[in-house]
Swiss-Prot record:
Residues 95-126 are annotated as: Disordered. Keywords: Ribonucleoprotein, Ribosomal protein, RNA-binding, rRNA-binding, tRNA-binding. Coiled coil: none annotated. Located at the top of the head of the 30S subunit, it contacts several helices of the 16S rRNA. In the 70S ribosome it contacts the 23S rRNA (bridge B1a) and protein L5 of the 50S subunit (bridge B1b), connecting the 2 subunits; these bridges are implicated in subunit movement. Contacts the tRNAs in the A and P-sites. One of its GO terms (cellular component) is small ribosomal subunit. Transmembrane segments: none annotated. The gene is rpsM. Belongs to the universal ribosomal protein uS13 family. GO terms for molecular function: rRNA binding; structural constituent of ribosome; tRNA binding. Pfam families: Ribosomal_S13. This is Small ribosomal subunit protein uS13. Part of the 30S ribosomal subunit. Forms a loose heterodimer with protein S19. Forms two bridges to the 50S subunit in the 70S ribosome.
Length: 126
């Protein structure tokens, strides 16, 4: 199992897919990285040489913010928005959707499970 920027890459996957296991690297960045380092995206992780791993590690560390650094940066951005009291910060503080999505219905992921209020039944037909 190859280890890159603190992440174990799955041995049997193609390199293009395996790189997406690193937080901050998606399909596009994976292909970009492989093109820049001259490594074939069709290679499997188990077929990588130590030189290839070194090339990948150096390229990623030099050009992208990934894993812990990126997570810290995102958390700091959210904290800053909460502190300055902007609209997005208020939405984060209240645990509601931040980017303008509707909340009358849906938004269950952000709002959590429903909290039913007693005595709010709709009258039935007679």
């Amino acid at each position: 199992m190859a280890r890159l920027v603190g992440v174990d890459l799955p041995r049997d996957k193609r390199l293009e897919v395996a790189l997406t296991y690193i937080y901050g690297i998606g399909r596009t960045r994976a292909l970009e990285t492989l093109a820049a380092t001259g490594i074939s995206p069709d290679l499997r992780v188990r077929d990588l040489t130590d030189d290839d791993l070194l090339k990948l590690r150096e390229w990623i560390e030099a050009n992208y913010r990934v894993e812990g650094d990126l997570r810290r940066e995102v958390a700091a951005d959210i904290r800053r928005k909460i502190e300055i009291g902007c609209y997005q910060g208020i939405r984060h503080r209240r645990g509601l959707p931040v980017r303008g999505q509707r909340t009358h219905t849906n938004a269950r992921t952000r709002k959590g499970p429903r909290k039913t209020v007693a005595g709010k039944k709709k009258p039935g037909k007679k």
